[in-house]
Regions:
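Bacterial Sec-dependent N-terminal signal peptides
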Residues: 1-32
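Aromatic- and glycine-enriched pocket-lining scaffold segments that form the walls
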Residues: 161-204
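Hydrophobic core register within WD40 beta-propeller blades
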Residues: 67, 114-116, 177-180
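Short coil/turn segments that connect the beta-strands within blades of beta-propeller domains
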Residues: 72-73, 123-126, 185-188
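Residues forming well-ordered secondary-structure scaffolds
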Residues: 18, 141-144, 185, 195
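A broad, low-specificity signal marking well-ordered, structured residues that form hydrophobic/aromatic
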Residues: 114, 126, 144
Length: 204
């Protein structure tokens, strides 16, 4: 999937994409495992869904999380936008995320500030899109960035591709991201909103 900037879009498109995303998310086992703040987890691999007790020390995320599983519902990895953890709840070797080079992420927060989509051209790879907040010289930056996670790395537990980590897409963004599949090419549209204007940015 090639990521490239497209033009700004209007608010009505966001509403449409949010509805489409809901339908897409319910269609595959890739979205059967959910994590949220302070160690809470639920799986939709069972009927009815099962709440899985998880120690807060394992998933002590306080803000937004994003999770991806295999097409059969096996957990692959998850993130809060600050670190990426594998299915064994270990931080991936290259999974600590930064803002500008060597500047730690302060936090990643918002209703949906981290989003994972599969690579349409490689079933072993996934794109993680994140809105990251970091402080540099007293100024707080809010950037949209992405990483590529390759599940063939780290003995099959997955890791961030070193040449595709924290790739910058846009600045001054709000803490919300959404996505929908482009039917003609099987790629994904990624949409976010400016933090200070009424503009939307879309990427394909």
């Amino acid at each position: 999937m090639k990521v490239q900037p497209i033009i700004m879009f209007r608010k009505i498109i966001l509403i449409f994409l949010l509805m489409v995303q809901g339908m897409f998310a319910s269609a595959q086992g890739q979205f059967n495992n959910w994590f949220w703040s302070l160690g809470q987890r639920i799986t939709f691999n069972t009927n009815p869904p099962t709440v899985i007790p998880t120690a807060a020390s394992i998933t002590s995320f306080a803000y937004t999380t994003a999770v991806i599983s295999s097409p059969t519902g096996v957990l692959l990895f998850y993130t809060d936008g600050k670190v990426i953890k594998d299915a064994a709840h270990n931080t991936m070797p290259n999974g600590t995320l930064n803002g500008a080079p060597n500047i730690p992420v302060t936090y990643s927060t918002g209703k949906q500030s981290a989003l994972i989509v599969p690579d349409p051209g490689n079933s072993n790879r996934y794109y993680l899109f994140i809105v990251i907040y970091y402080n540099s010289g007293g100024t707080v930056y809010k950037d949209l960035r992405y990483c590529i996670i390759d599940m063939t790395l780290n003995s099959g537990m997955g890791d961030v591709v070193s040449t595709s980590k924290n790739v910058f897409l846009a600045s001054d963004v709000d803490g919300q991201i959404t996505a929908t599949r482009q039917t003609a090419t099987n790629n994904f549209w990624i949409l976010t909103h400016s933090n200070t204007t009424n503009n939307f940015s879309a990427f394909l």
